[in-house]
């Protein structure tokens, strides 16, 4: 309801919304079909549904692993295939997968979530090559996010003693939204959002074993994923199997607004590469000119 209201406030003449379990492939396909029937086609499709379980792997049940996989990974597959059914017929469109730095590097206490994001990354790689071969007009992008301040952490399933949080630094949802919009418009293979995403990927590439021990022995891997507030088990509800207060508009903001960042210099650099390249060339030219004209000249 909130998203529909905001779309209308921004000038949308008609808005269509659905509540659907993305683990149900048929239901997702019906949403895509109805959207095409109503509006005449699909231009952009964004896969963003996610659930998680905060706990050591041995405390997560087989059913919980299965549910996280069904929503995060298979939900992405279902959404992508539903969109492709229409986009391939038209020969154009844009699909954006909302990923995570954890698609490349798993962390403690989120094994189910990390595994599902790794699976999405593999699916993305395979499908993108297939589309470039058979239907290059359909663009496929993946946006790798850092920690984002959404309500998810107030209703995630957890067996931790204190309120869960994403590993800081935490960014505002608007940072993620700008990245997804840019990816939908430009169609890059991948877009890394935030310095932490780049650092995580680099560390895992260069020193994965050292990173294992760092996460195991420092607060980053364990204490940093919890606040100081104890969980009241008598009132805590999670959304692993069903939505929490589905009739209420929870908005996009979580409880970490006081500490979240509303800008990402790394994202700005990634989305302004021509300007950055031009600036580097200009600085290089100025320095070269200064060095040339400042160098001592021999007498004739």
Name each model feature, range by range.
Residues 56-57, 64-66, 279:
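Substrate-binding pocket helix/loop in short-chain dehydrogenase/reductase
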């Amino acid at each position: 309801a909130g998203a529909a209201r905001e779309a209308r406030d921004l000038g949308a003449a008609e808005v269509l919304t659905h509540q659907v379990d993305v683990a149900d492939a048929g239901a997702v396909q019906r949403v895509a079909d109805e959207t095409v029937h109503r509006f005449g086609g699909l231009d952009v499709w964004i896969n963003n549904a996610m659930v998680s379980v905060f706990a050591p792997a041995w405390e997560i049940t087989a059913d919980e692993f299965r549910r996280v996989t069904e929503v995060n990974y298979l939900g992405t597959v279902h959404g992508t295939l539903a969109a492709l059914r229409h986009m391939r017929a038209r020969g154009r469109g844009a699909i954006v997968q909302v990923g995570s730095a954890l698609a490349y590097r798993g962390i403690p206490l989120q094994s189910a979530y990390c595994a599902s994001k790794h699976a999405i990354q593999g699916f993305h790689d395979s499908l993108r090559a297939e589309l470039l071969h058979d239907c290059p007009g359909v663009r496929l992008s993946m946006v790798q996010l850092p920690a984002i301040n959404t309500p998810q952490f107030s209703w995630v399933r957890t067996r931790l003693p204190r309120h869960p949080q994403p590993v800081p630094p935490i960014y505002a949802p608007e940072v993620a939204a700008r990245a997804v919009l840019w990816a939908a418009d430009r169609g890059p293979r991948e877009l890394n959002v935030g310095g932490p995403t780049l650092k995580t990927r680099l560390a895992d590439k260069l020193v994965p074993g050292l990173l294992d021990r760092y996460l195991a022995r420092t607060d980053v891997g364990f204490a940093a994923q919890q606040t100081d507030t104890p969980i009241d088990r008598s009132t805590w509800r999670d959304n692993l199997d069903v939505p929490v207060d589905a009739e209420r508009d929870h908005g996009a903001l979580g409880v970490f607004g006081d500490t979240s960042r509303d800008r990402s210099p790394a994202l700005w650099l990634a989305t302004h590469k021509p300007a950055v390249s031009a600036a580097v060339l200009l600085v290089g030219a100025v320095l070269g000119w200064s060095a040339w004209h400042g160098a001592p000249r021999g007498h004739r």
